[in-house]
Amino acid sequence: TPEDFARHLKMGYVAAQLGTRFIATPECRASDAYKQAIVAASAGDIVHTERLTGVPVAVIRNAFIERYGTRAGPFARWMLRGHRRKHWMRAFYTLRSVRGLRGSLASESANGYWQAGMSVGGIDSIQPAAQIVRQYAAALSAEGVVAA
């Protein structure tokens, strides 16, 4: 939330990653189903999967993720453990993930993976990006945080 953002910066954090919040905007090219999934999700709906890139990635739990699983298979785990092999496995995962992500972004069905962070619990509507930026700026001002 904007308030959490301002509070963390006041505590000494130097930055925040707000990618999930900006998916739920009219400006984002993601499907309406993806945006609505973000609005409907809570932090408990976020799981980490290593099956997309070989390293844990946060996604919204849905029927596809339940069916597909979150752990790499035995061969992939063996590949990922090897100093030289892991690069090949990650390249394979990345190429496959890019293709899958394109489909998931455009799809109106939940038959894919939708990346999202734990902040989904603080997102309750689809808003224009400019409005979100104004809300975050107002929260900074209310907390007395001066941007450097």
Give the location of each predicted region.
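Conserved active-site-proximal phosphate/metal-binding subdomains
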Residues: 2-148
